[in-house]
Amino acid sequence: MSAWLLPAGGLPGAGFCVPARQSPSSFSRVLRWPRPGLPGLLLLLLLPSPSALSAVFKVGVLGPWACDPIFARARPDLAARLAANRLNRDFALDGGPRFEVALLPEPCLTPGSLGAVSSALSRVSGLVGPVNPAACRPAELLAQEAGVALVPWGCPGTRAAGTTAPAVTPAADALYVLLRAFRWARVALITAPQDLWVEAGRALSTALRARGLPVALVTSMETSDRSGAREALGRIRDGPRVRVVIMVMHSVLLGGEEQRYLLEAAEELALTDGSLVFLPFDTLHYALSPGPEALAAFVNSSQLRRAHDAVLTLTRRCPPGGSVQDSLRRAQEHQELPLDLNLKQVSPLFGTIYDAVFLLAGGVKRARTAVGGGWVSGASVARQVREAQVSGFCGVLGRTEEPSFVLLDTDASGEQLFATHLLDPVLGSLRSAGTPMHFPRGGPAPGPDPSCWFDPDVICNGGVEPGLVFVGFLLVIGMGLTGAFLAHYLRHRLLHMQMASGPNKIILTLEDVTFLHPPGGSSRKVVQGSRSSLATRSASDIRSVPSQPQESTNVGLYEGDWVWLKKFPGEHHMAIRPATKTAFSKLRELRHENVALYLGLFLAGTADSPATPGEGILAVVSEHCARGSLHDLLAQREIKLDWMFKSSLLLDLIKGMRYLHHRGVAHGRLKSRNCVVDGRFVLKVTDHGHGRLLEAQRVLPEPPSAEDQLWTAPELLRDPSLERRGTLAGDVFSLAIIMQEVVCRSTPYAMLELTPEEVIQRVRSPPPLCRPLVSMDQAPMECIQLMTQCWAEHPELRPSMDLTFDLFKSINKGRKTNIIDSMLRMLEQYSSNLEDLIRERTEELEQEKQKTDRLLTQMLPPSVAEALKMGTSVEPEYFEEVTLYFSDIVGFTTISAMSEPIEVVDLLNDLYTLFDAIIGAHDVYKVETIGDAYMVASGLPQRNGQRHAAEIANMSLDILSAVGSFRMRHMPEVPVRIRIGLHSGPCVAGVVGLTMPRYCLFGDTVNTASRMESTGLPYRIHVNMSTVRILRALDQGFQMECRGRTELKGKGIEDTYWLVGRLGFNKPIPKPPDLQPGASNHGISLQEIPPERRKKLEKARPGQFTGK
């Protein structure tokens, strides 16, 4: 089938003409018109000849414009239209066809892409596309059948044949030339999870393998996030060794998030150290220019800048001094593109779409010239495209002598791209551009592979003869097996000797441990209760008891010292596995003042040390601490714990966990019951590594109860496998819960009044977040903030144990916590007869302190007041946007003149008490009152997004409604009218002065808000345009009336508005008074003044009866 060019007029009355489809046999025949009859013949005689009419060639541009936002940024509509306009202008000079361009959407899923290709080929004479490689081969066959010229631009490895023209960008050829030049044969591909990129990866791997390269791995990111990137990179790291990783996804330079996550994950996994080269695939389809502009995405990410040092960018080349952005700028200057188009937001893929349309047009022109201006077929157009040479968007397209690709690399600073090599895929050449390549850390390029991979006539086996490879393989395997066997045997024998006897003995039996039973008790009863209750037993009592352990025995004597036994779950433990011995040996090597020492593994019930018949006891033996667990200590209310005591215990806990984390040990079971306190009140962490031992012994842990899980981090609650192993971030969360126990001296989450099951369910499945509540009077603010950081929902937001240690030390400002002094002080308090008096004075002091704190928080914001109490300086703070409220009393000067001073004070007190009660219901802050002026702000000191405008507007409506019914006690017949002005904008807030400090606001926003009030009217809320915009954006139904142009002193003339209500606001609003011509807007009229007060006013202000 052929694509014919018909006269644009078509048949009489037919309108625009589209390309007609003819059978193959019609090529040898003359196109026949339908018989028009006599009227038609007369009309045909009047028509000009077909050659005098322009013809139409309809081009379809197919791509995922609607489903992929980064493809849509190429503005394919503008690119295709610009190409068509220029083509029509140029072709009109030589009588060529007129081009029409149709933008056709291609779904991002493969099945939809095939349907889009089939539909497109029935509507156009030439097709640019598709993008999905899975649709490329079907598109070639369908285009061949339909006789439509096809110009692919997203199909790596496509060969020109039939009606299919060469690809606009020969991606596979260009990549092969680059890999051959550096002899990088072993490559791996990582694709984004979308169908389009998965198919592109498959097509590219097929094309590279067809050229003889050993593509080691083609993998896809399962999800478009950091975890998906890490999993894909892990498969490459654990797979066969490769030199190059090709990233088949949107480039990070165009905003591709998948490639960003991939490079950041590669940096974290140390894969960007120079051992691998990362090549982006999509940059082969458009032209990037050297310079700093391309790296704008790295401005706020030093990690991404470092990772991109391992990336080489192969991209299409523009002529020297030219770029896609320059061409876009010239087109806009010539008004070929909209003037309001933001060129920086346009993807360089714009030029590729433009070039594809121009290449197709060049083929049409050459085909028409070859047949003398006649009609042409799709095959002839495709054939001529292969030989065409046209002027592209930023350079010459087709067969040129200049390289069509350029290799870009970053310098050592990673601040801009440099051209290092020029590449010609047609000639297969690569030559230097003058700038050397820079690899990470200034190291060399990855080593080359054998050259045989790039020689089609040689079967490549890595450059070594197969026989030698086989012999070497056998030798290496034999030596490795022999060495492994000897090492295992010697290690096993040595370990067995060390564990069985000597100072490093770890396997303990009944001959080593003496167990405790109460005097006179039966053999089945043992000591119950907390660890601290065992401290009263003497060594002689212990040694007099028969050595027969029972199931609940957990305390004994070993080498004259108290020991504690932590039993393994289950029964019938007849032997200790070698893996358990190895794991315990590593745990026993942990020595720290705040980590309980592991002494050995106790085993009873074997043939050598029989216990109760049918039972086998396996337990971890550790040092025993006389004071019991931290949980027991907190439960003993007779022990008074001040902050020094608490901070000492917490600091010991943090030190112990910090040591474990430095040794790579995640506790996983940290709770207050696993923190023990010795006789010197030193806290030690115990039960660490218990999960490792259970796993090595292949013992299933007992299912934890809800109460035992109160210390567990939310991510561990959601993943039981993580909960068994434990994580470092999970230990930080558990530490925060223990801090709450110590600070509040209560069980975890006790203040929430929920059952443990309810707490676990809420912690596991937010929102809302479920965390303990700690008041500021129970601990320093820094301690509460540290707790809040440690129990953050996301593990990566929690501080490390090192940072936690530094932050906690800073709470006491470097003072050392001496727990012995604290104990002595407490003992003195117990023995002193002044205890009651001290308690009474302390309570009085606390009450006075609370009064002072309340008074201070009424004068200053709580955060500022707290900072002043802590003795720290309060730095001024900049707020990007707040809303200010100003109001005053109309005619206040007149009212003051008619009133006694005490009556004025009563008036202001009554009015401001009313205002204060109203603002308590809104998220606002009262700044100050000066005379009759009342100033309120929202959005500071606590930011609340854009709600500040709505909060002030609602408060203003409530105040205005309340003032309507307010009356002065001494002049109830005189109305109290107020003027209100609102304005939004930035300001700076800070504390001014040391004596009677004030929290003041500064900035032009304050002046403008004051001007809005002073130019307002009685019973009116005067709103500036800045506040109106925010209220309209919030869309909460605020009703405003335009006042018109208003002159603001020092600001000029601006448009202002009246706020008159809000949808759903049903409170009455007083009606503004009617203004008489010539009357003042800011005073009280003579008629409103009572006669008895008017005389006083006449004496105070002769001849003046109105005014403020």
From Swiss-Prot:
UniProt topology in membrane: Single-pass type I membrane protein
Family under the similarity heading: Belongs to the adenylyl cyclase class-4/guanylyl cyclase family.
GO BP annotations listed: cGMP biosynthetic process; cGMP-mediated signaling; visual perception
Superkingdom, natural source: Eukaryota
Protein name: Retinal guanylyl cyclase 1
S-S pairs: 108-136
Region (Disordered): 1069-1108
Subunit structure: Homodimer; requires homodimerization for guanylyl cyclase activity. Interacts (via C-terminus) with RD3 (via C-terminus); promotes the exit of GUCY2E from the endoplasmic reticulum and its trafficking to the photoreceptor outer segments. Interaction with RD3 negatively regulates GUCY2E guanylate cyclase activity.
Note: The gene name nomenclature of retinal guanylyl cyclase 1 is confusing; for mouse the gene name is GUCY2E whereas the gene name is GUCY2D for human and rat orthologs.
EC category name: lyase
Signal peptide: 1-54
Key words, A-Z: Cell projection, cGMP biosynthesis, Disulfide bond, Endoplasmic reticulum, Glycoprotein, GTP-binding, Lyase, Membrane, Nucleotide-binding, Sensory transduction, Signal, Transmembrane, Transmembrane helix, Vision
Catalysed reactions, as listed in the record: GTP = 3',5'-cyclic GMP + diphosphate
Pfam families assigned: ANF_receptor, Guanylate_cyc, HNOBA, PK_Tyr_Ser-Thr
PTM entry text: There are 9 conserved cysteine residues in sensory guanylate cyclases, 6 in the extracellular domain, which may be involved in intra- or interchain disulfide bonds.
Naturally occurring in which organism (per UniProt): Mus musculus (Mouse)
GO cellular component: endoplasmic reticulum membrane; photoreceptor outer segment membrane
Residue ranges annotated as Extracellular topological domain: 55-465
